[in-house]
Amino acid sequence: VFSFEQRDGRTDKWGGNFTVGSSDIGLTAEGPLGEKSSVLLSARRSYLQFLFDAIGLPFLPTYNDFQYKQKIKINQKNELTIIGLGAIDEFGLNLQDDTSAFQQYILGNLPFQTQWNYTIGASYKHYRERGYSTIVASRNMLNNRAYKYIDNDDSKESNLIFDYTSREMENKFRYEETLDIKRFRVKGGINYELARYTNNTYQLIPVGTDVITVDYQSELPLQKWGAFVQSSTSIFDYRLTLSFGLRADANNYSTSMQNLLDQLSPRFSASYKLTDTWSANFNTGIYYQ
């Protein structure tokens, strides 16, 4: 199980670094924005397309990604975190005149591809004496595009034999409460998600002496909601940690999935600290997708 978190930007002064690797180049900058805020910015771009072109490969990938994080400490009990992630990926073709027969075959079948995605969100936390509240709102989107022309000649629209565009969009909201009650930590919350998937596909498929035209547009809107509660504690001089949780999820994809009680997911885990560097772990549960 992995857990990734963006680190906070520096609060003392501005700084940054510039990196050059074997396949990409990157820039990072961070520093304070006033007395109560810090920001972290980064951008990276690959130059694999130049390497692939130099060694004569028929495809030319280019990757770009961006990150942004700002943390605002409103006061001792309230803080706001804003994040942004984005990426633009392009998969071009190396249309040189001196390609081999094998490369020409690959070029005749590989489509041009582009993909971009982003995630933006904000997290607000309010701290109390024995716990804190968390409110999270976010939006993410993924766009995929692939197309192909006969002999890679896009001078005529009639040469188009494949055109595919899909989009996935999700708007999410989550509210959580975390409480410390004696030796127990209790966490509970609710979530709601509004999602939409669209697909536009055009393709000419040769079948014998005939050509079948596939041309359709589809859309799938979806709403999801859920709730969870979890409690954990440590016993035996904090060597044994026990955790029990219960989660329920539902959505409007079909009537059989709209009742939270029909998708109850109990979970249990235990971790025993054998030494300072070794521990034994046990996990079990029921999961729904």
Language-model features: locations:
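N-terminal periplasmic accessory domains that precede
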Residues: V1-G16, L27, G31
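Periplasmic-side early beta-strands and strand-to-turn transitions of outer-membrane beta-barrels
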Residues: R10-D12, P32-Q115
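Solvent-exposed loop/turn segments connecting transmembrane beta-strands
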Residues: N17-G26, L57-L60, Y253-L261
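Feature captures outer-membrane beta-barrel proteins of Gram-negative bacteria and organelles
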Residues: I25-K36, L40-R44, N64-I72, A227-V229, ...
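Flexible, surface-exposed loop regions and adjacent strand-edge segments
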Residues: L57-T62, Q96-I106, I150-L160, Q203-I212, ...
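Face-selective signature of the C-terminal outer-membrane beta-barrel domain
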Residues: K71-D89, P111-M257
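Surface-exposed extracellular loop regions of Gram-negative outer-membrane beta-barrel proteins
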Residues: G92, Q96-F102, N143-R145, T198-V207, ...
